[in-house]
Design a protein with these regions (language model features):
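Conserved structural core of kinase catalytic domains
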Residues: 6-7, 11-45
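Middle-to-C-terminal accessory/interaction subdomains
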Residues: 2-5, 10, 14, 42-204
Length: 204
């Protein structure tokens, strides 16, 4: 976040969002940006051709079979997908659905890497608190229940096991106590700025 002043006048606290680019992923994975391919997966009718092969394999293939599932794993980074999906579910990201994500892979000369999933927008994290909590099945939320890619993967027992295990890790590790331990020191840092912003825009 940052505090914005215009000609000395306080304009409030603003959140700075990161833009996912080839440079971003090149710094993380190593190599040059020219070797990184990035796509924005936005609408079912606009599946990028580069991603279409994997998408069709998962949504139209016999994913319950070992052979098909192994072909899928050759094209996707399973750990990345599990973290992406389980985190969005656990944090209740209300802007989350399968067509609001960024995918990237290394695709340099003579090399085609696995697809990785990346958060595109988490500014409304915990925004589902009124419709998705301990008493509501998050899986029934439209962005998840209508996801053909996830449905295809869930036909495979190995994926089911991996998905349950990763979600269990989130539940066991990201507890209320650990969250409070991390967030409480930040509260005092942001309290004044948040209060001033709310007062400026009449949000109190």
């Amino acid at each position: 976040g940052c505090l914005v002043f215009v000609d000395g006048e306080f304009w409030g606290l603003y959140l700075m969002g990161r833009v996912n680019t080839a440079e971003t992923f090149a710094r993380r994975a190593g190599g040059s940006p020219e070797e990184i391919q990035v796509i924005e997966n936005r609408y079912p009718s606009q599946i990028a051709p580069e991603y279409g092969e994997l998408y069709r394999l998962v949504t139209e293939g016999n994913t319950s079979g070992h052979g098909t599932y192994q072909k899928i794993l050759e094209q996707m980074d399973l750990e990345s997908y599990l973290d992406y999906y389980c985190a969005n579910l656990y944090f209740g990201n209300s802007q989350f659905d399968s067509f609001s994500t960024t995918l990237w892979r290394r695709a340099g000369e003579g090399e085609t890497g696995k697809w990785h999933w990346e958060f595109s927008d988490a500014t409304d994290t915990l925004g589902r608190n009124k419709v998705s909590n301990y008493s509501v099945n998050t899986y029934l939320c439209p962005g998840v229940a209508e996801d053909l890619f996830l449905q295809g993967l869930l036909k495979n027992k190995d994926f089911q096991t991996a998905f349950r295990q990763r979600m269990r890790e989130y539940v066991e590790e990201l507890t209320k106590e650990k969250a409070e331990e991390y967030l409480t020191p930040l509260l005092e840092t942001y309290r004044v700025a948040v209060t001033a912003t709310a007062e400026r825009y009449g949000l109190r």
